[in-house]
From Swiss-Prot:
Keyword Zinc: no
Alphabetized UniProt keyword annotations: Nickel
Record family assignment: Belongs to the LarC family.
MF annotations from Gene Ontology: lyase activity; nickel cation binding
Pfam family, one: Ni_insertion
Keyword 4Fe-4S among UniProt keywords: no
Protein name: Putative nickel insertion protein
PANTHER family in UniProt: NICKEL INSERTION PROTEIN-RELATED (PTHR36566), PYRIDINIUM-3,5-BISTHIOCARBOXYLIC ACID MONONUCLEOTIDE NICKEL INSERTION PROTEIN (PTHR36566:SF1)
């Protein structure tokens, strides 16, 4: 199974993510072609090699023509919806922008629709977020991991004045994420970097065994006594089956308006749940109820528990630690009459399974105005001939 690991020894920011992923050897022209599917103008991208403490990495500089442009969250979501990017990228991008906007709204005591500021409105942030997601999709990795994040210390000047490091919005975004301080001064994690990494990666204390194939370094803009670089590794996970430790949060609910469950499930996924499901149950005194089950990475326990307590009527949550085995998987492409479609293929000990990617099938069904089941059936027939 192909995996990617973010080694955040100097923190993380949007431009560092872009630089590190491009440094892996991505086809930059193909990436820029994908960027052109975003309905925004007024920027150009400069990519160069730079040295940080004798280590060379890729520096990505996004030059904005108009520095006076401001946008609200609604504007950003419209840009995402109107882009020609994949549904997978659109969903993750919306989650990232929501995280930044929610954090700023809470810190500045504003309704989320009134948040009007540089951080989510700036063009470079739009390119950081969507550009990073495009690069990750181009790499076709199945698993993404990250080290804990160093927060830095001191103070930083912003459009809102001088604020402490980590910036309050950054810390808000990182609730439930493993972080640490080691005495280094300076802002090491930006709100954009925090929002991207907390959306795409599973945080681990130790990197699972991986056969490293490529290594990339992305340059930060500031110079410190240590190399201001983000390092990424890409390679194959070594174990025949990937083992993953998760937590299951459960609670029985019998006194809540059922309309709330749909919103709750969406909220839990947005906050980092791996899976959420509802099971009808009979509880004490013969009362019908719903068993809410949430599967999540260990580091998301506190964050998701808070969502459950805040959004439901429950007074308690059970937690169960579980080990999960995953068949090694890879993504392949198959040529169809509608264009290329991604296929997820899993193999272990002679057992083979293959499935067309749902988002690709959904896009075809919507574009061609044909039933989704017909699209899936046609692609499955093509897969049998391969």
């Amino acid at each position: 199974m192909k995996a990617l690991y973010f080694d955040c020894f100097s923190g993380i920011s949007g431009d560092m993510i872009l630089g590190a992923l491009i440094d892996l050897g991505i086809d930059v022209e193909k990436w820029k072609t994908e960027l052109n599917k975003i309905p925004v103008k007024g920027y150009k991208i400069e990519i160069s090699k730079k040295q940080k403490n004798s280590i060379w990495g890729t520096d990505v500089n996004i030059i904005i023509d108009d520095h006076h442009s401001h946008r609200h969250l609604e504007d950003l979501l419209k840009i995402v919806d109107e882009s020609g990017l994949s549904e997978n990228i659109k969903t993750k991008a919306k989650n990232i922008f929501y995280k930044i906007a929610e954090a700023e709204a809470k810190i500045h005591n504003q309704p989320i629709d009134e948040v009007h500021f540089h951080e989510i409105g700036a063009l470079d942030t739009i390119i950081d977020v969507l550009g990073s997601l495009i690069l990750l999709e181009m790499l076709e990795v199945e698993e993404i991991y990250s080290s804990p994040l160093p927060l830095g210390s001191g103070f930083v000047n912003t459009a809102h004045g001088t604020i402490p490091v980590p910036a309050p919005a950054t810390l808000e975004i990182l609730r439930g994420i493993p972080v640490y301080k080691d005495g280094r001064e300076g802002e090491l994690v930006t709100p954009t970097g925090a929002a991207i990494i907390s959306t795409v990666a599973n945080f681990v204390q130790e990197l699972p065994p991986i056969r490293v194939d490529k290594i990339g370094y992305g340059c930060g803009k500031k110079d410190f006594s240590f190399p201001n670089l983000l390092r990424v590794y890409v390679g194959e996970l070594v174990e025949s089956t990937v083992k993953e430790r998760n937590i299951v949060l459960e609670t029985n609910i019998d006194d809540m308006n059922p309309q709330i469950f749909g919103y709750l499930v969406e909220k839990l996924f947005k906050e980092g749940a791996l899976d959420v499901f509802l099971t009808p149950v009979y509880m004490k005194k013969g009362r019908p109820g719903i068993l809410l089950s949430v599967i999540a990475p260990l580091v998301m326990e506190e964050r998701l528990s808070e969502v459950i307590f805040r959004e439901t009527t429950t007074l308690g949550i059970r937690k169960i630690y579980v080990d999960k085995k995953i068949m090694p998987r890879e993504i392949k492409e198959i040529e169809t009459k509608w264009g290329k479609v991604r296929i997820k293929v899993a193999n272990i000990n002679g057992i083979r399974k293959a499935y067309p990617e749902y988002e690709d099938c959904k896009s075809i069904a919507e574009r061609e105005n044909i039933p989704l089941k017909d699209v899936i059936l046609e692609i499955e027939k093509l897969m049998e001939r391969e």
